[in-house]
From Swiss-Prot:
Cofactor: Fe(2+)
Native source species: Staphylococcus epidermidis (strain ATCC 35984 / DSM 28319 / BCRC 17069 / CCUG 31568 / BM 3577 / RP62A)
Protein name: Peptide deformylase
EC number: 3.5.1.88
Family as reported in the entry's similarity comment: Belongs to the polypeptide deformylase family.
Reaction catalysed by this enzyme: N-terminal N-formyl-L-methionyl-[peptide] + H2O = N-terminal L-methionyl-[peptide] + formate
InterPro entries per UniProt: Peptide_deformylase, Peptide_deformylase_sf
UniProt cross-references to SUPFAM superfamilies, sorted A to Z: Peptide deformylase
Binding site for Fe cation: C111, H154, H158
Top class in the EC scheme: hydrolase
Keyword annotations: Hydrolase, Iron, Metal-binding, Protein biosynthesis
Catalytic-site annotation from UniProt: E155
Function according to Swiss-Prot or TrEMBL: Removes the formyl group from the N-terminal Met of newly synthesized proteins. Requires at least a dipeptide for an efficient rate of reaction. N-terminal L-methionine is a prerequisite for activity but the enzyme has broad specificity at other positions.
Top-level taxon of the source organism: Bacteria
Amino acid sequence: MITMKDIIRDGHPTLREKAKELSFPLSNNDKETLRAMREFLINSQDEETAKRYGLRSGVGLAAPQINEPKRMIAVYLPDDGNGKSYDYMLVNPKIMSYSVQEAYLPTGEGCLSVDENIPGLVHRHHRVTIKAQDIDGNDVKLRLKGYPAIVFQHEIDHLNGIMFYDYIDANEPLKPHEEAVEV
């Protein structure tokens, strides 16, 4: 079971590496890692389990965050606010297309690998199309917008050594870009 002690923190070199693509079939170890990542997200969102194990709540986790520089992410978002849920374990995810229009969370973003609150708006694409494989190597294609699009972009950034705060404007951290949509 993954706990907070397994999640590496900001400053660890793995968080700035470009993760390696995986080939199929996945090793049993990689499959177990991906399942454990999903399990962490579910546990972190369960109040009792999170309290028992000292877990911070999360909706996404990338393998580099547990010091595995591999292109694997898990997203567990039981309700996106519009009645749609997202429960994915993805391998080698890629953003294939994206909207010009940007979106941001008015409260900024957080990260399980970043302990402190870093104020500032993170502008991302409002819509994205993602291609990946599931744990068995089947092709997956997702069209996302709004909050789910932001979550998946955040996790894919981890696979490329990018942290959310890299996008925050140092001069005007709380100023929304023109035409950007608040999510």
